[in-house]
A protein has these predicted regions:
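Conserved N-terminal structural module of periplasmic/extracytoplasmic solute-binding proteins
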Residues: 2-104, 109, 120-124, 335, ...
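Extracytoplasmic/periplasmic substrate-recognition and gating elements
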Residues: 61-62, 248, 291-359
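Short helix-initiation/N-cap motifs at beta->coil->alpha
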Residues: 72-81, 174-179, 255-267
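Hinge/lid segment of periplasmic solute-binding proteins
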Residues: 100-154
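Short, solvent-exposed loop/beta-turn-alpha elements that line the ligand-binding surface or hinge
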Residues: 116-129, 196, 213-237, 291-295, ...
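Extracytoplasmic/periplasmic solute-binding protein
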Residues: 142-148, 154, 178-228
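Glycine-centered hinge/linker elements that transmit conformational signals in sensory
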Residues: 181, 224-256
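C-terminal capping/gating helix-and-loop segments adjacent to ligand/active sites or protein-protein/ligand interfaces
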Residues: 320, 360-370, 381-436
């Protein structure tokens, strides 16, 4: 599983580098608008890279006169490279991304094409995609990106074998979670695995607690720039609840030294050292690939995050990545823009690509895939993922993607401190209020 899907955010990277260095990559094409055809940058790493490349190859074979030249980049370099290229006016025609706050920064700098009228004229393209996928593609009511690839909700995973051994049931509420903590600790099993060194893994807990306690309106107020939004009473309650879990030894000892990018947190679950793990849907593929017979023998359980007693949020709501996104550079030529849009219409999420995503344990953001999902050897998990994505009244984008890069980095720094108990919920709120709208 590529780290782009397990490490969704690329925040806090080195500042600008020389353009010649920033534009070096794994592929063979050159950026910018020269040499004919369109250009497309995306992340390397199998099996996702192979699916993306296959879609480009299929489009090029069907359109020999209008080629797309693709270039791959390692995950940890991509954000800096694309930012540098956009600033220099040398971006590729098609820009791969996560939508949300980063897309807004592109829009405000007039670096990407407004696709609203194109989608109006090509309603058949929009109508084949999950409606929830368009939220992170939209800025101030206008669409600036084509949703693509797969939906990645955050899921509560658990080790069925460990639960059976301890004689307990999966949690149906927050109180159940807190009651399970001493039961597992008494058996020498960590209640929850957590790759806390990576910071964004901690964030998933707050995303769900904010939603389940206060509903989506609490974080939406942050997005809308409402003054002191982080100090909302329900936000303080959510921040307090997660510290209650830390104080109760709810997480693996030394979680702040465990990294998610190395999949160390995944190993804690499938080896039985931890009973549960809150993580992205991509974890299923990692567990399947690295956990021996853990998945095939039915030992991996999964569910949406349970409700919090007295909470205002709908327990069917989801959080995570509603899709990945393709934008068109505003600096591209008219010919290049046409090729990109033709690719969106006839090359993205076609039948072969959809099948490949499903075979890799992912749920594509195309509607009407229920039969393919049901026929997969991962049907139970894929149907859970599809159900969350298609039935959620609200699907909140991962906070570090929804916010601006500046606010997101402050968020991640303070989340780490919150989990280390080095700041209080009120201090967290004060620190985050200072970067609202920045």
């Amino acid at each position: 599983m590529e780290t782009s899907l397990s490490r969704r955010t690329l925040l806090g990277m080195a500042a600008a580098v020389p353009l010649s260095a920033a534009l070096s990559a794994c592929g063979s094409s050159s950026p910018g608008q020269g040499g004919g055809g369109a250009t497309y940058w995306y992340l390397s790493g199998q099996p996702q890279e192979g699916v993306r490349a296959g879609a480009v190859d299929a489009f090029n074979k069907a359109n020999p006169e209008t080629q797309i030249k693709d270039t791959t980049f390692q995950n940890d370099a991509y954000k800096t490279k694309i930012k540098t290229a956009l600033g220099a006016g040398q971006a590729p025609t098609i820009i791969w991304g996560w939508g949300g706050g980063t897309l807004r920064s592109y829009v405000e700098a007039d670096q990407v094409e407004d696709l609203t009228s194109w989608f109006d004229e090509h309603s058949e393209v929009k109508d084949r995609l999950l409606p929830a996928s368009f939220g992170a593609a939209t800025v101030d009511g206008r669409i600036y990106a084509m949703p693509c690839e797969n939906v990645q909700p955050i899921v509560l995973f658990y080790n069925r074998e460990v639960f059976d051994r301890v004689g307990v049931e999966p949690p149906e509420s927050w109180d159940d979670i807190m009651a399970l903590v001493p039961r597992f600790n008494a058996e020498g099993i960590a209640p929850f695995s957590l790759g806390g060194q990576s910071r964004w893994t901690n964030m998933m807990w707050l995303e769900f607690l904010f939603d389940r306690i206060g509903g989506p309106e609490v974080f939406q107020a942050v997005i809308e720039g409402e003054k002191d939004a982080w100090s909302h009473p329900d936000a303080i309650t959510a921040l307090t609840r997660v510290q209650d879990l830390v104080k109760a030894d709810g997480f693996i000892k030394g979680f702040s030294s465990v990294t998610a990018d190395s999949n160390a947190d995944q190993a804690l679950l499938y080896t039985g050292r931890a009973a549960m793990m809150l993580h992205g849907a991509w974890s299923y593929g990692i567990q399947k690939a690295e956990g021996g017979d853990f998945v095939s023998s039915g030992k991996l359980g999964f569910m949406n995050f349970p409700p919090v007693e007295g909470g205002k949020g709908d327990p069917g709501n989801g959080v995570g990545n509603p899709a990945q996104y393709l934008s068109v550079s505003s600096r591209a030529s008219a010919e290049e823009k046409k090729i990109a849009k033709d690719f969106f219409a006839t090359g993205v999420l076609q039948d072969d690509e959809v099948k490949k995503w499903i075979d890799n344990g992912s749920v594509p953001v195309r509607l009407g895939t229920e039969k393919l999902l049901a026929a997969s050897d991962s049907a139970d998990f894929l149907q859970l993922t599809y159900g969350i994505a298609s039935n959620a009244k609200t699907f909140v984008q991962s906070w570090d993607q929804a916010l601006s890069p500046t606010a997101a980095e402050t968020l991640l720094d303070n989340i780490a401190k919150l989990f280390q108990l080095s700041i209080s919920p009120k201090q967290f709120a004060t620190n985050l209020n200072a970067v609202i709208g920045k």
